[in-house]
Amino acid sequence: MAKNALLLALAVLTILYIAVWIVYLRRTFSPDAPKEKVKLAPQLGIGFFANFMDTLGVGSFALTSSIYKLFGLVQDDLIPGTMNVGHALPTAAEAFIFIGAAIVPVEFPTLISMIAAAVVGAWVGAGTVSKWPKRRIQIGMGIALFCGALLMLGSILGWLPGGGTALGLSGRNLLIAVFFNFMFGALQQLGIGLYAPCMILIYLMGMNQLAAFPIMMGSCAFLMPVGGFRFIKEARYSPKAAIGLAIGGIPGVLLAYYVVKSLPLLYVRWLVVFVVLYTSAMLLRSAATESAAEANSRSHAPEPAGK
């Protein structure tokens, strides 16, 4: 019953998200609006590949942000918004599949509390990030990707906790979990995926490993449309790139879950760690270059008259 209610709420939110996005897209692609130089075909491929790998366990945010930065496909300051807007629908598809197939029944108060916390965090985080200047976003994403690479490395090397048997939390432990999921929802708006830190949190709280999936999937599926709303409203994303991620991503999810199901991904995960670390360094270097250029511009600015 609780699962059905959750899936119904997700369906309503997803439909609302699509409707709002279409309204804004009609304005974006009106005859008078400036034309984007982004090409749709590569974005479809990125959406397919990133969400295919996401369904198999390699995060779509790390892959997408790395590809965008390495190949210069989307402006640095538009990457967080583009990922949150574009990956929202494929993530909803993942959530419908994984929550619908969930074998372990997570206690409803725990599930709802953690999802709600992530959603509020996303709303606050997106409202903040969507107003940040380019340099601050570069620094934030650089740090976020570095942290994400460390989490992936910990997963590969088996450093992460193993979990327990609990199917729910109460009292102080629930409050702690809610607080941290709020923070994870906010941080996702910068590009650090919620899955890995949320999974670690659930394991540290002594919960069943399988309980992580409905909580993670539910949190991301609900928080991404909410965060996406703010990026769409502030026009801090690439519309054409986000469309490509969404359209290409859903078939990637379906193919990975229903056809491929599993792959030997150890070497892929190692490659992703190195690529993400390199991308993190590139973003921080870009931020330093931007800062130096601003300082140089200020030093050469003419002094106000009368001094």
Regions found by a protein language model. Name each.
Residues 1-50, 99-190, 203-204, 209, ...:
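Juxtamembrane transmembrane-helix boundary motif
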Residues 56-65, 190-199:
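Transmembrane helix boundary and interhelical junction motifs in multipass membrane proteins
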Residues 58-61, 90-98, 125, 227-230, ...:
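Alpha-helical transmembrane segments and their lipid-water interface positions
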Residues 63, 123-124, 197, 229, ...:
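Residue-level hotspots within transmembrane alpha-helices of multi-pass secondary transporters
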Residues 69, 199-206:
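Short amphipathic helix-loop junctions that connect adjacent transmembrane helices
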Residues 72-85, 109, 206-217, 240:
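Membrane-interface alpha-helices at helix entry/exit sites of multi-pass transporters
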Residues 81-97, 219-225, 251-252:
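Membrane-embedded alpha-helical segments of transport systems
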